[in-house]
Amino acid sequence: MEQDTAAVAATVAAADATATIVVIEDEQPGPSTSQEEGAAAAATEATAATEKGEKKKEKNVSSFQLKLAAKAPKSEKEMDPEYEEKMKADRAKRFEFLLKQTELFAHFIQPSAQKSPTSPLNMKLGRPRIKKDEKQSLISAGDYRHRRTEQEEDEELLSESRKTSNVCIRFEVSPSYVKGGPLRDYQIRGLNWLISLYENGVNGILADEMGLGKTLQTIALLGYLKHYRNIPGPHMVLVPKSTLHNWMNEFKRWVPSLRVICFVGDKDARAAFIRDEMMPGEWDVCVTSYEMVIKEKSVFKKFHWRYLVIDEAHRIKNEKSKLSEIVREFKSTNRLLLTGTPLQNNLHELWALLNFLLPDVFNSADDFDSWFDTKNCLGDQKLVERLHAVLKPFLLRRIKTDVEKSLPPKKEIKIYLGLSKMQREWYTKILMKDIDVLNSSGKMDKMRLLNILMQLRKCCNHPYLFDGAEPGPPYTTDEHIVSNSGKMVVLDKLLAKLKEQGSRVLIFSQMTRLLDILEDYCMWRGYEYCRLDGQTPHEEREEAIEAFNAPNSSKFIFMLSTRAGGLGINLASADVVILYDSDWNPQVDLQAMDRAHRIGQKKPVRVFRLITDNTVEERIVERAEIKLRLDSIVIQQGRLIDQQSNKLAKEEMLQMIRHGATHVFASKESELTDEDITTILERGEKKTAEMNERLQKMGESSLRNFRMDIEQSLYKFEGEDYREKQKLGMVEWIEPPKRERKANYAVDAYFREALRVSEPKIPKAPRPPKQPNVQDFQFFPPRLFELLEKEILYYRKTIGYKVPRNPDIPNPALAQREEQKKIDGAEPLTPEETEEKEKLLTQGFTNWTKRDFNQFIKANEKYGRDDIDNIAREVEGKSPEEVMEYSAVFWERCNELQDIEKIMAQIERGEARIQRRISIKKALDAKIARYKAPFHQLRIQYGTSKGKNYTEEEDRFLICMLHKMGFDRENVYEELRQCVRNAPQFRFDWFIKSRTAMEFQRRCNTLISLIEKENMEIEERERAEKKKRATKTPMVKFSAFS
């Protein structure tokens, strides 16, 4: 807080020494107070007026705005004289202000200012009528009264009388025009800092930590301009689309006297809005999104904006981006950038922001880069101090722990958990698929490594994210959705405990498909929830937020995708944040936490981060923690982070993938335990404290040379430096698990040699010139491949072939010796073996080509393995008998195929779809059968998943028509779309008539899920009632004497 106060005080004190500072110490709330009017009169003596005069002035401003809007289309380049004069005056004050801050600005101002003929540095100060020599002679003669002429003195007095007083207003309490409640102490200081920037003609960056009220401070500044400077607008506030609603609410809540419009909508709506709302000019502030600015830039260029505010300013850090280029074309008197994340990019991106704020000062990127020497800036303390001095006048950043003492604390606990049995199987399968990458020390493809990382992270989250992993069809939502994921097991226990405590929970994940799984889980457990991701429409987004934040809301969980839900959303009614998975960039996770840990939060916030132990996740979190720690050290010192240190190197990714691989291979059993959630949390809290302590020590030792620590922390593990091992080619060999599979080694060896699957870089070994061409899908007898392999080895022996060493395989020397040993000991085929070989060559499916085989596989996928008749129709030129014979051999010997895992996955996916279609048809039949007139009587139990777009009448029509036409019919949704368009009841329903076939398919899938859930509940009730009746039925005893 002391640094914050000092920074603001230094900025204000750097104003002109002759400036008048009006301190407003106490105000009574109300629409207009005498103190306010008095302060305004003292501040702007030349323009002060009575209340009637102020209204007249405001009317004039509005008429000027209207006139500007009307004239602008004729000549966009035409500059208003008043605006031009203001810009010129601001430039002079800006240069003077910056030079008072530090002489370093002379380096930037001099070259840029000299180019402008109107530069204050090029202006002559005074007009001496007497030459220097003459004046000096008069002084030496004792004549002081004639050294300045009467004309000179008159001109100086007239010039001084024409100057307006440079007044800087400084608030001590919350301004009276702020109606939503008093500003906090640090927010008042932030407002004073913004005012001082405006008065000195300087633009700036407000970089307070998220949740400290940057929005409120910005709105208060615009209110100051209206109430104290008679500048109601026009102002533009440029924000992300997701925060439009929030900005409009904040304007209405805090400074309702500002007339605010929201520019958003489709093409027709925008055209009407421009005509009816924007061009008349009856507004002060225009709030719009980045997308709208890009689409309607010609409209926005017609205005001379008094203040241009950009929220999430990192969007313009690339000066060549479309948005950055467009906003630079707008005419604006002042500019303000808002960002909640620290400046963590390279020097050139910082220059892009400074160039946007002060293009007349920072006009050369090359000059800026050379002055701060990108390579040496982070290591040279003098350059660091120089950069800090340049940033200081423009940048204000405070963090919660320093300024917001009343905000409850935030505590993060990392919960380490194990893999389930299914997760271990899938994790092993992913690693085995790319085992050559794990054990390679040569060149690696970065995209391949990124893909492996992504697949491993999916496995850590939930194995059902992979197609074919979930048991079914039919698919059910019950205990297996929890027990097959280690994270879900812990989450299930944790949520039950939080529900008992009365907490409300935010769950963040990067994967929207995982949110689908969580939705099913919440419906199964009966938890009421809201959901928000990148596909959520703007209206539904706002409705969900309002429903969750409503007083006495019954919503227990709000699930969000990390990227979509990380910005501009206030969910302070929740007090628990669960990070289901972690982002590469720790700032994104911090943004997610700040949805709950922000002003307005009344409870301590607990953050639970789920981490799968001994997997790639452990390394990802460790790297993110190191990066965050280093960022905080550097930013607090006013430095910038070298962007190169943030890039994920290939070696780094490989170490992450390798981490824990041996542990996973060691067993196939589940690592999940029956510990209660209290024990799990205590262990996680202990490990979190240990990691924080370790990082704290690391930070202290890396203040001067932190780049080295990044490498050490990633490459040092369990006391060993893996960089040295890698240089020596001694990286530990990861032993894959022994596969329990019936293997025919002769077949495998033959096709590995023939297809060259695992050795792409080594030239093919020689083969006999007249060897037959056989394929694995032709299913020749295994004995044939033994004879062919023997023939090849003897041929290589006769020509003296020496096996080369392949550096890309494990233990190349050992593999080379074993292969050469086979060749050296080879024997020729005997006459009996040659005759046997010729006989075996006739026993395979020699008339089946690769095309026939592919058709057979696709037909199995389409119809299922048992529908031989339909499969035979798909394989051209083959009779049903031939296909049946081939199918029998295929399913008996399919493990001999090289790509059997891929083939089986393809067929099983198709069969799963077939079973799914059957189960859906049964569900629809059961639902429709319960009604005599389903088109009029059918009801759907929505629960919490109704949505706001489709009505119940529309949903009823979709389901009944889908059942009537046949769910599994080809192009059924396109036909359904035509039925909707022709239905008389929808002739005026524009919404449903404008939906596409794909949208109807998505809606029907949602409705089918609801129907299946309803059917399951009905079946369970019927079973329970049947069981109940059976227990109540009395036993009747018959007697022989009755």
Swiss-Prot record:
Residues 51-60, 73-82, 828-837 have a biased composition (Basic and acidic residues). The modification Phosphoserine is found at residues 116, 119. ATP binds at residues 208-215. Changing residue 214 to A: Loss of ATPase activity. No effect on replication fork location. The modification Phosphotyrosine is found at residue 942. The keyword Zinc does not apply. Residues 36-50 have a biased composition (Low complexity). Belongs to the SNF2/RAD54 helicase family. ISWI subfamily. This is SWI/SNF-related matrix-associated actin-dependent regulator of chromatin subfamily A member 1. The gene is SMARCA1.
